[in-house]
Amino acid sequence: MAKLEQHLTGDFGQIVEFIHQELMRQSMSISLEECSKNQIQGKRIELRVYERFSYAGGNRTSLTVQFIETKDGADVCGIATGGSQAVFWKINTLGESAFLETLDVAIRAWNSTGHA
């Protein structure tokens, strides 16, 4: 399992859509499996679960991305899971790391557009 947390500044809805589009653009096999939208104490929260085939690991991996609205943007947390092999310990976690890297690339792209 691999995790990435980052605060992004800008419009919450634009952040969510931009990250989604960047993730979809980076992989031919990626799909948005499920999405949940809620509001708690006036703050929007969106949870998205993506899945893709990992050529690096030769298996399927998932990436869960949570967006929590803040005063000036969104707190983003991405957790990649799956793709490891073996029963009692994790080996071959290449797919998880590679999938999480796509989120990192998307976040850097958002920041490079002048929103950081």
Residue locations for each model-derived region?
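A conserved amphipathic terminal alpha-helix motif
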Residues: A86-A116
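Beta-strand/loop substructures that line and gate deep hydrophobic ligand-binding cavities in soluble
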Residues: G57-I91
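Terminal, regulation- and interaction-focused segments at domain boundaries
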Residues: M1-S27, R108, S112, A116
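Hydrophobic transmembrane alpha-helix bundles
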Residues: R25-L32, Q66-G78, L103-V105, H115-A116
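Short, Lys/Arg-enriched charge-dense amphipathic segments
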Residues: L4-E5, E51-T64, F99-V105
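Ser/Thr-rich, low-complexity intrinsically disordered terminal regions
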Residues: E17-L63, K71
